[in-house]
């Protein structure tokens, strides 16, 4: 986003700075001092810097509102900042004030920003969904400024946008459809979701499951050329369907407790790992569900935890070589993915202040996969580019094929697939189910979805 926004509004030098280890304070009148707010902490707090190198204080006030009052995550704050910096660059490039709201609606600053978003959609600079989000976030920014009376009535001669009521079709977690009235605006950017073509499934993104031949090639290269930790990460994705965020926030004690307290299920030879909720293993939206992990994989992970390689990595990390540490650490002792629990631990100041905190979001794992794919392509292997999340889709389709062999009515396996995939909404599961009916079995499965 940043580079395209900068090039489109090249006159503006506005940018985002981040304040690390941010803990907001409040003025305590009794002691005439500023004290830190309890339980409010942000590892990377965004600050929008204008072209004259001054802080855009309106945005800072909004970010503090999101952090303190709405308890929004660091990731959400960064995402909002990336949208508001685009609006700031627009203001500077056009030399318009945020309160430029003349009588004619099309001249108002918000309407003109809306027009630039539509122009960029046509030029292919941004997607309709990105433009829609950006416009909505700018309007929520205005809502905050109005609600907090930051502007006087004299300054607000006209409204930045008009509110409208509309109805949307919603789907319950059970698949039932109902109509719901929602508030919208006359500046809403409408778009139709892109149709799914070829071998795609939609599950928190557009996924491309590996074909059986691609999976075979990938596993061969994974075994021959990848590090042991990256092998295990990929095996967890392929054989449990877990997301990268979940895999990389598993702690050593989770593995050891499974072995000590559980017996392997004699039907499918798996252990049960509870993720999400209070487990301190992160999931999408904190959704709590069970992962079924093959017994052989738990054994392999436990052996890895006893290895010199893991001990060396753990000794360099925050949690040291203790069971509270992550299973998966880079060579430098950093987590592949920073967990919510670690952020909370930093908030509680459990670590030395001398230790510099940095957020990790799986980039090291993605780079390892890219390196492996490049090697496969260099060797002329017939395999497409894919992501770690595509391994989850591969698990989903493999599971579907296996389960479908044991029932006459495909609807009977929907709850089972939903549970194994950890889908909060059954419609995501149905996307996988549909792939069976849009397939010609020329190869074991040509994955497709018509969502």
PLM segments and residue spans:
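N-terminal core-binding DNA-recognition domain of tyrosine recombinases/integrases
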Residues: 59-78, 82-177, 220
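Short, charged phosphate-coordinating catalytic segments
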Residues: 147-152, 237-266
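Flexible interdomain linker/hinge and immediately adjacent N-terminus
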Residues: 155-214
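Basic, Lys/Arg- and aromatic-enriched nucleic-acid-binding interface segment
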Residues: 212-244, 413
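Conserved tyrosine-mediated DNA breakage-rejoining catalytic core shared by Y-recombinases
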Residues: 250-300, 307-325, 334
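Active-site/catalytic core of tyrosine-dependent DNA strand-transfer enzymes
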Residues: 294-383
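C-terminal catalytic core of tyrosine-transesterase DNA break-rejoin enzymes
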Residues: 390-423
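Catalytic-site neighborhood detector that most strongly recognizes the C-terminal catalytic loop/helix
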Residues: 421-446
């Amino acid at each position: 986003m940043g580079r395209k926004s900068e090039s489109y509004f090249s006159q503006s030098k506005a940018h985002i700075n981040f304040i690390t280890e941010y803990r907001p304070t409040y003025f305590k009148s009794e002691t005439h001092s500023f004290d830190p707010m309890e339980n409010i902490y942000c590892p990377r707090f965004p600050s929008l810097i204008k072209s004259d190198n001054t802080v855009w204080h309106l945005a800072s006030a909004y970010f503090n509102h999101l952090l303190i009052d709405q308890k929004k995550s660091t990731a959400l704050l960064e995402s909002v900042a990336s949208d508001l910096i685009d609006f700031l660059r627009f203001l500077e490039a056009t030399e318009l004030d945020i309160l430029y709201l003349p009588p004619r609606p099309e001249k108002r600053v918000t309407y003109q920003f809306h027009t630039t978003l539509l122009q960029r959609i046509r030029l292919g600079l941004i997607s309709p969904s990105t433009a829609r989000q950006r416009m909505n976030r700018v309007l929520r920014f205005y809502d905050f400024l109005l609600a907090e009376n930051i502007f006087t009535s004299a300054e607000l001669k006209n409204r930045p946008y008009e509110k409208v009521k509309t109805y949307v079709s919603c789907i319950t977690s059970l698949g039932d459809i109902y109509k719901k009235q929602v508030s919208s605006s006359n500046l809403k950017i409408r778009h139709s979701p892109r149709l799914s073509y070829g071998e795609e499934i939609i599950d928190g993104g557009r996924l491309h499951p590996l074909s059986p031949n691609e999976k075979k090639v990938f596993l061969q290269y994974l075994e021959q050329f990848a590090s042991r930790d990256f092998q295990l990460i990929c095996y967890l994705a392929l054989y449990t369907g877990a997301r990268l965020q979940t895999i990389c926030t598993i702690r050593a004690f989770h593995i050891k407790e499974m072995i000590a307290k559980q017996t392997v299920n004699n039907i499918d030879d798996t252990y049960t790992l509870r993720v999400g909720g209070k487990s301190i293993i992160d999931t999408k939206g904190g959704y709590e569900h069970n992962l079924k992990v093959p017994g052989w994989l738990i054994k392999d992970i436990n052996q890895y935890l006893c290895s010199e390689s893991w001990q060396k990595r753990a000794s360099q990390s925050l949690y040291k070589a203790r069971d509270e540490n992550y299973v998966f650490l880079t060579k430098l002792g950093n987590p592949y993915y920073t967990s919510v629990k670690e952020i909370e631990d930093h908030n509680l100041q459990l670590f030395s202040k001398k230790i510099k905190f940095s957020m990790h979001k799986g980039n090291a794992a993605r780079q390892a996969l890219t390196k492996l794919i490049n090697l496969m392509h260099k060797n002329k292997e017939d395999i497409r580019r894919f992501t770690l999340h595509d391994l989850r889709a591969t698990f989903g389709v493999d599971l579907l094929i296996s389960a479908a062999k044991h029932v006459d009515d495909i609807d009977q396996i929907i709850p089972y697939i939903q549970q194994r995939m950890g889908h909060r909404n059954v419609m995501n599961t149905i996307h996988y189910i549909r792939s069976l009916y849009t397939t010609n079995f020329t190869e074991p499965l040509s994955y497709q979805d018509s969502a």
